[in-house]
């Protein structure tokens, strides 16, 4: 079946494009882009169009990269659940038994997921055309940027659809897609900025390289996904995939998780073969030993291997070569936790609703505090242990005699570790809070990611935007206080005194240390930002924990919550 008479495509388009969410999201997307253009519009009274104004190029780069990042982050939310949604709705077996060819199924899912994103990107074209009369950017650069953008979105969409073939849950497919897509997004941004001064070469490379890479990645993934649907794995009752953890460990490639050995048992303890001890929390024990890893360990193994692969070069560059840039390695650790943490918390309550066991859980003799802490600590334990694996290079650098800078900044390292720990707690709390409100795990996970992006990424983006386009304005203090909510800003603001290749960053000059207004040699003005972050994060977690405890005490509120 072709594109025009593909029933999968027709059904998906009707479901996706005729909902209120589609129109609301399109309106918000356009309003956000228009707001960026409006506030970043040059304030000069006179513009010399014969020159190449840098302000215009900055504006267009901001628009393109913002558009690219937002669209790239939205792609897995539309495509990662294309196949896993059928599995969760228990229609996957019916779809495989239909006369549709697997290629038609994959093609219909891919085109349907990408159609709405194509509409979002295409409708942004009139907005960017407003910048062309300002000069500095040619029409061919705009054309090349949109060609590269569409090629990237098609590639990311195919990665997300293919990920849904190998996972049963949308949450696992979503996280696996992000693990693969985010490094590609960063590489694309680096490519765009590295050729900023060579506009013609960037246009030629974009028009030639991006389509070739898109075909090289998308075509093999399309064939692999079609073959997997043609020869699916064993299906159990209700069309559920039968997963044997021992067989999966034998056939796995690369990392193998041994649940009975250290350190794997820290985040994946083996299944219980004896009775629980008296006073043990049955919710916590069930979540840790059966629930979290009940659908296999493929997503977990992929997350560990990708994170370790990226950590090796980042560790060498930021922790040993350019030690003044070591906060960027902490940013990588924080980003990993923001990506992996909600997976183990955002489905804690929604999974009970999907199995229709939540009412049974709420009518047991377990207290609300036991249910709440069991759900929270299980997800927090897994995410924090996985995140701690990435902190071993920092601990190693602290103990290495040939790198004395970190021992000289011992309190700074402790503050970094504290920021990572608070971030782990916040991601688990936000995920569990969203899971208490929504009915589907996929919805809860997407909302959790959206909340964390608004909480941790939007404030530093607003601060950077204000510094660039409103350097002397009353908005500066507001942007400073908002940025205090983000741990990414906090790890950079904490003072770090290192002798990096013979030079010390001016903002962290040694002359500031030891002043009269200081704590252990660090000026109070450098500690102020981290203190605000510490206080704000503690208040947020206390408020979320208190709210969820109240909800679990009022059992009917959790039981009857809907989308």
Where are these regions (language model features)?
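Short, surface-exposed helix/turn micro-motifs that flank interaction/cofactor sites
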Residues: 10, 96, 106-107, 285, ...
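General helical structural elements
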Residues: 15, 25, 91-93, 113, ...
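Transmembrane helix boundary and interhelical loop/hinge segments in multi-pass membrane proteins
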Residues: 75-96, 109-110, 325-329, 342-362, ...
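Internal catalytic domains of large membrane-associated glycosyltransferases
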Residues: 15, 87, 102-103, 109-110, ...
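Transmembrane alpha-helical segments and their membrane-interface loop/helix boundaries
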Residues: 1-72, 81, 120, 126-347, ...
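Hydrophobic/aromatic positions within or immediately flanking transmembrane alpha-helices
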Residues: 93, 106, 174-175, 359, ...
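Start (N-cap) of specific transmembrane helices in multi-pass transporter permeases
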Residues: 104-117, 161, 165, 370-383, ...
